[in-house]
């Protein structure tokens, strides 16, 4: 048997011979570092400081060289298309570009919503603001019908609408508004007819002891009794002269009348 050497030169020579056939192993291929992942979008992505023209051109040329080397490696190694696709997509879609697209799409949506709202709002406003202008002849006829009957039936409403050249809905709304107006007028009249409350001064009656006792207003005025109910006797203070007679009669007897005959 022929002894084969295991030196590095022999191994590399074998790999070079096997490379054109396309049957080289993964272990013999050179190591390619992974591309860095793109940064998350931030508000400072748009504010990238500019450098001088010479530096920018140098960076562009170095980037082109690195991209060409990566393409050559891609053809030699078919297991790297996903890596290059991810790096290419990260180069094409920058964070600043994604933010710009998001703001533009949101602005377009808001503008479309505003235009739709404006296109719909004038129609609704016109429908709400449309009010029928009744002629004096129509108003007099409607007032006469309202004085006769405040609630119209379907047949009567139809006849009145055809005679006045109006729709049934217009006649119905007019009668509703007229009933509300009459209700407000009645409420105003009731408030005006109620007299304001009168506050009477508080009176006092002086008894022999010299202490004033207030008299309630109920002692001067009593409501009439119900015919089917017995009148309730309210407390009425006795007149002053009655108390004076009682006090004079009591003073005729001495305080120690029984003690003299003991």
Curated annotation (Swiss-Prot):
Key words of the record: Developmental protein, DNA-binding, Homeobox, Nucleus
Domain of life: Eukaryota
Localization: Nucleus
Organism annotation: Xenopus tropicalis
Protein name (record): Homeobox protein vent1
Keyword check for DNA-binding: yes
UniProt free text on domains: The N-terminal region is required for repressor function.
Principal location listed in the UniProt entry: nucleus
Comp. bias intervals (Basic and acidic residues): 16-26, 44-55, 114-128
DNA-binding interval(s): 127-186
């Amino acid at each position: 048997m022929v002894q084969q050497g295991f030196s590095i030169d022999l191994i590399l020579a074998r790999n070079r011979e096997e490379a054109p056939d396309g049957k080289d192993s993964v272990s013999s291929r050179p190591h390619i570092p992974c591309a860095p992942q793109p940064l998350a979008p931030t508000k400072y992505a748009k504010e990238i400081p500019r450098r001088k023209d010479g530096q920018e051109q140098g960076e562009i040329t170095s980037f082109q060289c690195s991209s060409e080397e990566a393409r050559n490696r891609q053809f030699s190694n078919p297991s790297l298309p996903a890596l290059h696709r991810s790096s290419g997509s990260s180069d094409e879609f920058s964070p600043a570009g994604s933010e710009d697209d998001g703001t533009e799409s949101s602005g377009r949506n808001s503008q479309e919503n505003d235009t739709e709202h404006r296109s719909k709002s004038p129609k609704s406003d016109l429908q709400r603001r449309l009010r029928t202008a009744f002629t004096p002849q129509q108003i007099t006829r409607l007032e006469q019908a309202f004085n006769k009957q405040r609630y119209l039936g379907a047949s009567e409403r139809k006849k009145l609408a055809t005679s006045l050249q109006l729709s049934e809905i217009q006649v119905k709304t007019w009668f509703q508004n007229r009933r509300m107006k009459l209700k407000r007028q009645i409420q105003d009249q009731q408030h005006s007819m109620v007299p304001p409350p009168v506050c009477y001064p508080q009176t006092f009656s002086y008894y022999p002891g010299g202490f004033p006792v207030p008299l309630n207003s109920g002692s001067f005025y009593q409501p009439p009794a119900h015919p089917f109910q017995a009148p309730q006797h309210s407390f009425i203070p006795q007149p002053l002269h009655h108390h004076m007679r009682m006090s004079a009669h009591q003073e005729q007897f001495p305080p120690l009348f029984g003690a003299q005959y003991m």
